Amino acid sequence: MKRRALLGSAAALLAQARVSLAQTPGGRKVVFEHDLPEVNLKGWSATVVEVSYAPGEASAAHRHPGITIAYVLEGEIRSKVGDEPEKTYTTGQMFLETPGQLHAVSRNASATKPAKLLAVLLAEKGKQLTTPA
């Protein structure tokens, strides 16, 4: 039950972010759906982080100990997670990282415009949220 509540909270945070960016009349639509790994969320917490990239800026390869759901707030983010091919995500798109998965590429796809994403990190309390690869 706690797992549902925590994931529901994460979904609500992301839904709120989407509404604040572009209020559209006429209901709801699914913007992201992904199967989740089996985890016990007892003793876990949710942390929401805004990540801003200057034009051309990149993050070093890294991993997260829990589940990360990322939502692009502004610009375009180039990303490679796990075995998936490298992909560009634009404003309003989302991606997911499962526990321990390598996030090999995370960078602003533009050399001239800034980019920003909102990351919801679900992890055990007290764990470092990001570790170098």
Listing of model-derived features with the role each one plays in the protein:
Residues 101-127:
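Ligand-binding loop in jelly-roll beta-barrel domains
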Residues 84-100:
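Short acidic-glycine-tyrosine-enriched beta hairpin
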Residues 2-23:
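N-terminal export signals
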Residues 57-69:
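A short beta-loop-beta micro-motif enriched in histidine and acidic residues
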Residues 26-60, 124:
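A short glycine-rich, His/Asp/Glu-containing loop-to-beta-strand
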